[in-house]
Amino acid sequence: MSTAIALPRHKLSVTDYHQMITTGILTGEDHVELIDGDLIEMAPAGPEHADFVAYLGRILRTQTVLLVREEKPVTLPEHSEPEPDIALVKPRRYLEAHPYPEDVLMIIEVADTSLDKDKSVKVPLYARFRIPEVWIVDVQGGAVESFWEPWVTAEFAQYAHSKRVERDVITSETIPGITLSLNELWKGST
C-alpha cells in the first residue's frame, strides 16, 4: 500500500512569472495564467467563448467610462496574475504594470468549459483581493451568477452575497448603469 507524500513546493511569484516571459521560457504559445504560485493551463478560447467575450465587451463599453479590458492580466500580489475574460478597471493607462486589485471594480468570467474552476478557484481568489463584484457567465447553464461584497477573514475569502439570473436583466450591485439583457445575451447561442 502506498501513501501520498506531501512534497514541498515552490510558489512562483509574479516577478518570477514575468521573468519567465521576458526570457522566453514562456511564450505566446503557452496559454497559462499564474494562480496562487502555480502555472495553470487555460483552455483555448473556442468561437462561442470568443463571441460572448466580444459581445460583453461591446455592450459594457456603451454603459461605462471605466476601461473594459478583455482577456488581459490583472496582478494580485504576490503569487497570482489571472487573465479574466473581462475586467472593468479605473480609466487610465497601464503602461508600467497591469491593474492591481485597487484598480479593478468588476471581473466577468465566461464559463463555457471552466465553470467549476471559475467558481471554486477564481471567485475565492478575487474575493481574497477584495474585487468588489464578479460575474460568472454560465454558457451551458444559460445563467449569470453575480457575487459582490467580499468577505475576508484569516481562514477564508468569499462573497457575502450572490444571485443567479437566468432571464430578463442582470444589474451590477456595485457599478451604477451596468445592466445586461440576458435575452439578448443568449440570442444565437446554442
Per-segment meaning from a language model:
Residues 1-190:
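Gly/Pro/Ser/Thr-rich low-complexity, intrinsically disordered segments predominantly at protein N-termini
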